[in-house]
């Protein structure tokens, strides 16, 4: 029933998107964004990573690479926040040069607001600045399990702490300068701790307004430096109304922030279990959006086909906001490379193995089909 409601809701939005006077279906066009989101390489992997961008990713049509750096950079502004094996500025420059030569736009990421811990370990920011913790009374367990009485998934920093932005914005600026980046990805997914009652600064405040306030503050900071903000989109979807749930959408009322944040934020709309048709919702709200996938090849292929159809049928103003697709990788670089290389074996691994690399190969074939269809339609008859 929930699935039928979601499809009816999305179909109605889709029809609205297509309803322009005298509009005819547009010819298929290549996606403006054909991307991959992956962890930053370790210093020892930089040369291989640069060659991989040139020889493999560009050949597959990738033109956007979201690089999950977080604290794995040798920050000069806050050296106390360097990770264990940080990239140097020279190593980042090597990646930037390789990306530029391959026609790949690099977008660095630091998780802001949420994802400030993982299981039993605090993230670097809260290790060094525990006063930024939104929930200091929640102790990280020796052995993590979900569910748990504290509903602890990941810690958050308090968005109203007076000292937090001076620190994190220094990191953002330094990293963007090193990457010569036109855009920055702030994460902001799966934020479960926000506006907690016991927080002396934001307890009792509207969670949607808190989330929107943090998005807007980051966006305004980047805009003042001629950069744009990308974020994950799950906190902007109503998990109950849509039936999508509390992971790929929100159960803590942050979804209303969609009407409170600037429209020039780019939304990364991730769905991994099924191809929810939510990109059109974001596009109709005025946002540019990319559909994001993970480890189910058929789901990823369906997301590509759906987005192609949305772009083909939508009015021009909406079509230009449906930017494309991004394959996400949640292992380290080594893990993805192992999957990637295993698919070259004869015979290849069974279908239940190498699922992320298999999904990416399938999706990149799908967007090649889209480009071929567009080229064929352009031929004289």
Q: Model-found features: residue ranges?
A:
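N-terminal secretory signal peptides that target proteins for export/translocation
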Residues: 1-5
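Intrinsically disordered and other compositionally biased segments
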Residues: 6-9, 114
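Bacterial N-terminal signal peptides
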Residues: 8-20
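N-terminal hydrophobic targeting/anchoring segments and the immediately downstream early-domain regions
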Residues: 24-55, 59-60, 64, 135-138, ...
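Aromatic-lined carbohydrate-binding surfaces of glycoside hydrolases
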Residues: 35-251, 257-261, 265
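Catalytic-core regions of glycoside hydrolase
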Residues: 63, 178, 200-362
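Carbohydrate-binding surfaces of carbohydrate-active enzymes
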Residues: 355-381
């Amino acid at each position: 029933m929930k699935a039928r409601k979601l499809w009816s809701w999305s179909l109605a939005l889709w029809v609205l998107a297509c309803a322009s006077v005298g509009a005819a279906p547009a010819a298929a066009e290549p996606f403006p964004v054909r991307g991959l989101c992956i962890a930053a390489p370790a210093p020892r992997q930089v040369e291989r990573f640069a060659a991989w961008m040139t020889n493999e990713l560009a050949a597959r049509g990738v033109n956007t690479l979201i690089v999950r750096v977080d604290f794995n950079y040798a920050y000069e502004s806050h050296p106390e926040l360097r990770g264990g094996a940080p990239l140097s500025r020279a190593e980042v420059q090597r990646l930037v040069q390789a990306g530029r030569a391959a026609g790949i736009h690099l977008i660095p990421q630091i998780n802001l607001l949420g994802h400030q811990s993982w299981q039993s370990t605090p993230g670097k920011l809260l290790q060094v600045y525990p006063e930024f913790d939104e929930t200091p009374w929640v102790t990280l367990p020796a052995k993590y399990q979900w569910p748990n009485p504290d509903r602890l998934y990941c810690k958050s920093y308090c968005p109203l702490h007076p000292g937090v932005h001076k620190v994190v914005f220094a990191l953002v600026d330094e990293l963007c300068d090193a990457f010569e980046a036109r855009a920055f990805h702030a994460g902001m997914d799966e934020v479960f701790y926000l506006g907690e009652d016991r927080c002396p600064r934001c307890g009792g405040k509207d969670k949607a307004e808190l989330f929107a306030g943090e998005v807007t503050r980051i966006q305004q900071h980047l805009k003042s430096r001629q950069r744009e903000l990308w974020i994950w989109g799950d906190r902007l979807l109503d998990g109950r109304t849509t039936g999508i749930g509390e992971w790929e959408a929100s159960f803590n009322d942050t979804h209303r922030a969609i009407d409170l944040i600037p429209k020039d934020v780019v939304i990364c709309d991730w769905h991994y279990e099924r191809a929810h048709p939510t990109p059109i919702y974001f596009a109709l709200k005025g946002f540019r959006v990319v559909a994001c996938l993970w480890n189910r090849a058929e789901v990823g292929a369906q997301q590509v086909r759906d987005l192609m159809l949305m772009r083909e049928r939508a009015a021009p103003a909406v079509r230009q906001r449906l930017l494309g697709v991004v394959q996400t990788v949640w292992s380290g670089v080594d893990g993805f490379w192992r999957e990637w290389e295993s698919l070259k074996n004869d015979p290849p691994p069974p279908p239940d193995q190498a699922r992320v690399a298999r999904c990416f190969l399938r999706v990149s074939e799908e967007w090649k089909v889209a480009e071929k269809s567009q080229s064929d339609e352009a031929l004289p008859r």
